[in-house]
From Swiss-Prot:
GO MF terms, alphabetically ordered: glutaminase activity; pyridoxal 5'-phosphate synthase (glutamine hydrolysing) activity
Cellular compartments per GO CC: cytosol; glutaminase complex
Entry annotated with the keyword Hydrolase: yes
Native organism taxonomy: Bacteria, Pseudomonadati, Dictyoglomota, Dictyoglomia, Dictyoglomales
Protein name: Pyridoxal 5'-phosphate synthase subunit PdxT
Length: 190
């Protein structure tokens, strides 16, 4: 199995290290042709407007969207989630991939200094609580009817799934706990 990591910005190395720790080969996705050799893709955190600009410049936006619409499993964390979303409440003109039927609000928990971590129950990955690290995180403010909510914090979804797409408002790659990545890998292997 080969998992791609959208290698534009953000926590690329951290996701790569986690996947390699799990024995998974990784591909740093920088060009459309990289999408042809992967079994799933991670869209890491970063700055969502920058992601879009670079995706467009590298002709990756449409190619990635087509792959996702056709079933390529994806996991978006933080800004990656924003990129996957259908709507951005506080930036309605920002273009997104529109493959996850959610509305998000960018930087909803505040600025960098308001970043925090907390432990939550996520039943789909086991009984033990999971440390969720929020860094200038988005909030999911609305979900479509086919979106499953796997975890919440303060009554807001923080981990959702729709078809082949996982979306997280937090950064699982910044923990030592591989369970979120393991869950994603199960989705990639069918």
């Amino acid at each position: 199995m080969k998992i791609g990591i959208l290698a534009i910005q953000g926590s690329i190395v951290e996701h790569k290290n986690m996947l390699e720790r799990l024995g998974v080969e990784t591909v740093l996705v920088k060009k459309p042709e990289h999408l042809e050799i992967i079994d799933g893709i991670i869209l890491p955190g970063g700055e969502s407007t920058t992601f879009f600009t670079i995706l467009e410049n590298r002709l990756l936006f449409d190619a990635l969207r087509e792959k996702l619409v056709n079933g390529l499993p994806a996991m978006g964390t933080c800004a990656g989630l924003i990129l996957l979303s259908s709507r951005i409440e506080n930036h309605p003109d920002q273009k997104t991939l529109k493959v996850l039927d959610i509305t998000v609000s960018r930087n909803a928990y505040g600025r960098q200094r308001e970043s925090f971590s907390t432990y939550v129950k996520i039943p789909v990955i086991g009984d033990r609580e999971y440390e969720c690290i929020f860094i200038r995180a988005p909030q999911i403010v609305e979900i479509g009817r086919n979106v499953k909510v796997h975890a919440t914090f303060n009554d807001r979804p923080i981990f959702v799934e729709e078809n082949n797409i996982l979306g997280l408002t937090f950064h699982p790659e910044l923990t030592d706990d591989p369970r979120i990545h393991e869950y994603f890998l199960k989705r990639c292997s069918g």
